[in-house]
């Protein structure tokens, strides 16, 4: 993304409009050595690795950005394309009937349902919109519905490029101007 903006003579200024915190919910059961662990976002991966020993799992991630959020040297058994609509169908072919632990946020869309035979979801963390000091900008790139809410709460009014249809829907719902949608 940065290369695209640089090529057009534009600058990117980043500011996350969400806060992630542990939910304090216990693990619903006892993970077995070599169970799969699916990490669905960079924030989830970083938080999970800070609180748990990830070496006991075979790790699957939503995409490359999530994999990169884990500590250096963490073995990743499978990395998805980053497209939530496809990832769980693809992952189901890899894990078969193995247990897959899914630490998820309070606002998850539960896209694994209907794909994974032995999904072990648990509400591991909360995502909350937060107010930030926005830099001067012409367009906002918003990566999630929660980020859209945080952007608006921060006084954002610029046209928005939303990552994914769910985010685009939230952008329209809260009255921001949708300039486009990226996959």
Question: Residue spans of the language-model regions?
Answer:
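Signature of uroporphyrinogen-III synthase
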Residues: 1-183
């Amino acid at each position: 993304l940065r290369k695209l903006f640089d090529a057009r003579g534009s600058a990117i200024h980043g500011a996350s409009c969400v806060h992630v915190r542990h939910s304090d919910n216990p693990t619903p059961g006892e993970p077995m050595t070599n169970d799969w662990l699916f990490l669905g976002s960079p924030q989830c991966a970083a938080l999970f690795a800070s609180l748990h020993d990830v070496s006991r799992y075979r790790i699957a991630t939503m995409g490359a950005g999530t994999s990169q959020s884990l500590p250096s040297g963490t073995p990743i058994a499978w990395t998805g394309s980053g497209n939530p609509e496809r990832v769980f169908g693809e992952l189901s072919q890899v894990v078969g009937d193995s247990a897959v632990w899914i630490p998820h946020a309070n606002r998850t869309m539960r896209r694994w349902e209907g794909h994974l035979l032995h999904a072990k979801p648990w509400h591991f963390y909360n995502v909350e919109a937060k107010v930030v000091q926005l830099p001067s900008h012409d367009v906002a790139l918003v990566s999630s519905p929660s980020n859209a809410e945080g952007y608006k709460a921060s006084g954002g009014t610029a046209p928005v490029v939303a990552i994914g249809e769910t985010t685009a829907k939230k952008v329209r719902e809260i009255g921001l101007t949708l300039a486009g949608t990226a996959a």
